[in-house]
Amino acid sequence: MIKHITTTPAKALEKLKAGNARYIDAKVNSEDISQAKRTDTLVNGQKPYAIIITCSDSRVIPENIFMTGIGELFVIRIAGNVIDEHQLGSIEYAASHLGAPLIVVMGHTPVSYTHLRAHETEADL
């Protein structure tokens, strides 16, 4: 059975903000990504303290932006941050089964997907 992290949404958000401040200052993620940590998460399960919904853009890396290690974030990537029942199922799984107490929708600019969709809509008018 997976042990849930006992934290509050406020504490999880505080931890994300602190990690982001370290990222802005250092831009190097020194969190544990060792083989031992990977093995531990395989044996004992993942225990994320936050669910991050973010764009599919390969340049947006939540684990680095928030300076986290393996198993700390449950990241869901979707173009334009538009969720449907599949992403909602992942959110429910992370919150209900894994015990992640915080959901963050992380956007960025410019968003190519949104720009593309807007121009496709204009062309259809």
PLM feature spans:
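Conserved small/polar residues in nucleotide/adenosyl-binding loops
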Residues: T114-T121
